[in-house]
């Protein structure tokens, strides 16, 4: 089987390409902090056994008295919300290199994992709950996105696609399929375009300002065998290993299925499948010379 790799560079003003189809959605409800939200986020995001972030606070230690910890978190979050400023200490990531398989001395055989401060994940969980209520429960999220949603899985997507293709093949039609893999999709997000996508999806007010500040001024450092290297600024993408990262990515690509003038596009996170139906390939190429 032959494969084709296509590299596409998206310009900073790429939002303008989709503006005619990506209409502004109803405005989101203002973000509010309360003990119930913090406790839900704490239970969901703090998992004993997970690695600690730059502050070295362990999940197991925080779980020992989660009510007292949640109360302390509430003060920090409320002050952060008032100023629309994400705590700078929570914008730092610790990166470690983990072998892909066994022991290796080759640089390419390692993959980086990013460790965030656990309190930041709790705060992200509170913010993410508000985004989900607006974006998913409000029906704004594209039905073609199968990732990051409760009740949806790769198995359901595969069944959906293969059944649709089978029905067309039974009609003696031809199915053309293009499997698209976005290289470093989460790391390549342009923050300027992300801001425009947030506005178009109805995210405004203190939540919008907080997310923009959350993305800006982030830093990371590499840790090797306990040795901490120099911090570096992160100017693109959403934080790896974060709670908000997948949600922001979903907003970023939410209008992608509406871009092709023909065919069908389905996504599971950044894995994308584009399919077209036709009787004869030559005829389809003449009629649909561009997608």
Predicted regions and their residues:
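Surface-exposed loop/turn segments and immediately adjacent short secondary-structure elements
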Residues: 1-108, 114, 122, 228, ...
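Hydrophobic (often cysteine-bearing) scaffold residues that line and stabilize catalytic clefts
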Residues: 34, 54, 58, 65, ...
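Conserved polymerase palm-domain catalytic core
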Residues: 182-269, 277, 281
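Conserved catalytic palm subdomain of right-hand nucleotidyl-transferase polymerases, strongest
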Residues: 48-57, 95, 106-115, 156-196
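Mobile genetic element proteins and their domesticated derivatives, centered on retroelements
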Residues: 4, 38, 53, 73, ...
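Short helix-interrupting loop/turn segments at helix-coil junctions
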Residues: 6-15, 48-52, 71, 83-88, ...
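Conserved pre-motif C helix in the palm subdomain of viral-like polymerases
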Residues: 108-139, 156-162, 183, 235-262
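Inter-domain linker/hinge segments that demarcate the starts of reverse transcriptase
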Residues: 35-46, 72-80, 126-131, 155-168, ...
